Amino acid sequence: MESSDQSKSELAREPEPDGTLLESSLGYRFRNPALLALALSALKQPLTPETAAARQRLEFLGDAAWNFAVALAVFRTQPQASPGDLTRFRAAWSSRTGLAQLAGRIGLPIPASPSPRGPSQRVLAELLESVLGAMVEDGGFEA
């Protein structure tokens, strides 16, 4: 995480009220619940530029960790698959559609949206990636 005073103050915020339910759904308890609150900050509008940047950093970390975890799982569970097939499996699990569906299955809070159809798959995927990034930042890759 960034070491600026603003980032530290953002991390000091209290977690969202539904954080405990989400932790139960994730099967992970945050040692630093403020990281989960930061990941879920996209649910609030407007965000300060500092909060948005810190949340995007968690999203970056979550995206990288997810891609690695999926690649490892596909590699181990598909021993006969060609490299092209492995890439397609990983792409399916890492797509916006796949991530948005997973976000719904694990019960991530749904951000408000001006669209009657709700938030886009991109928004849900990014929210999931930021939560995954918060988990990795909080507990390491084993989280």
PLM region spans:
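RNase III-family endoribonuclease catalytic core
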Residues: 2-143
